[in-house]
Amino acid sequence: MSGSLWLSLALSLAVLAQFKVSAAPNLVCFYDSQGSQRQGLAQFSITDIELALQFCTHLVYGYAGVNADNFEMQSINKRLDLEQRHLAQVTSMKERYPHIKFLLSVGGDADTNEGNQYIKLLESGQQGHRRFIESARDLVRRYNFDGLDLALQLPRNKPRKVHGDVGSAWKSFKKFFTGDYIVDTESETHKGQVTALIKDLSAALKQNDLLLSLTVLPNVNSSWYYDAPSIAPSLDFINLGTFDFLTPQRNPEEADFSAPTYEAVGQNRLGHYNLNFQMEHWLLQRVPANKINIGIATYGRTWKMSKDSGDSGMPVVSSTQGPAPAGPQSKQEGLLNWAEICSLMPNPSNSNARGPNAPVKRVVDPTKRYGSYAFRAADENGDHGLWISYDDPDSGSSKAMYARARNLGGVALFDLTQDDFRGQCTGDRFPMLRAIKYRLL
């Protein structure tokens, strides 16, 4: 074979290899560093992170915050991040996993020191933006991250109101014209400020070959705050928070699917409370599909059922009484991690249990459109009622298939610490993560 033919073949193979690498789906693994401070079976260690890394393309460390006084990005847990050197411990794994990109996320609903510091940051002008950008770049570089994830804590949509079907049409009509849906009268101004911040931040990071991703948190109206066509070129990828559409904190009086793939019609449901709507919104704004990662949660949302909630469990479940009690591991009202949910499914160890440890009835969605749920009707005293909306390895796998079928960038998993990382349920560690990864291959 002539030298020119060898050269042509080599170039063709190089192009093909580059295409294959670029076309590999993302599996962006969010890591809530607070998991390392939990106790008992819920404590998540560096060793656990390392086991998960074999399945991830990116690891996102959560979370940093914003100083409300000077708008600099800062640690919100200095004892863990800096004094105990947890930031450095995590990024030290880059030496063993050079193919994985490590990002530091700011915001993510973890920055609770000040209620509206992110709006203040947007309104701070060029000087405030510059302080944030320079401090973010410095923090990312100091701890050897490959980039920054911007998970801005912006005003949320108002939760769905509980009312009968008879009045729902009029109420929706009235809200549309009275502006009852509006939670930020300056959203158009803030959208322009978000655009300017992202463009300037991207330019600063790119000077140091650093990545920039955007995470759209659940129930933040993308059309209010994100000028998608303008910001997409400045972002390496976008993680959509396509879960927690309904939660017991936002919707205490009725339980419903918290993370459906498609719209579940009827019963006063809102058409945008589903993965497909959110994803289509960004595509319609001319964002490349390969920049969009759909979000999947490794936990379920839990409501307390009352006697008035009935015993069918079929959503929408009325007369619920807010968040169900916290689980023994996650210790957060209205939320159970996957290991806790799995332990409540009927099994030999709970077949005779009563009260809060009694098994739940699992209802699987054969269509894979809305998600599974499980419930335990309240007893004769009105106690121990429980309703859970969740994704499991099967539905997580189905959503990963959705991402592949739509040629999306991939999946963002929220988060590693809520998966069954000890293998308590079936013996398989990280069952959610594994199921999603295998379907993305």
Swiss-Prot record:
Annotated region (Disordered), positions in chain: 310-331
UniProt keyword annotation of Signal present: yes
Modifications made to the protein after synthesis: Glycosylated.
Main location: secreted
Glycosylation sites: N221
CDD domains in alphabetical order: GH18_IDGF (cd02873)
Secreted found in the keyword field: yes
GO annotation, biological process: carbohydrate metabolic process; chitin catabolic process; imaginal disc development
Any single Gene Ontology cellular-component annotation: extracellular region
SS bond list: C29-C56, C342-C425
Gene3D superfamilies: 3.10.50.10, Glycosidases (3.20.20.80)
Keywords annotated in UniProt: Developmental protein, Disulfide bond, Glycoprotein, Secreted, Signal
Residue intervals of the GH18 domain: 25-441
Subcellular location: Secreted
Cleavable signal peptide: 1-23
Gene Ontology MF annotations: chitin binding; chitinase activity; imaginal disc growth factor receptor binding
Family: Belongs to the glycosyl hydrolase 18 family. IDGF subfamily.
Function: Cooperates with insulin-like peptides to stimulate the proliferation, polarization and motility of imaginal disk cells. May act by stabilizing the binding of insulin-like peptides to its receptor through a simultaneous interaction with both molecules to form a multiprotein signaling complex.
Other observations noted: Lacks the typical Glu active site in position 153 that is replaced by a Gln residue, preventing the hydrolase activity. Its precise function remains unclear.
UniProt protein name: Chitinase-like protein Idgf3
Organism expressing this protein natively: Drosophila simulans (Fruit fly)
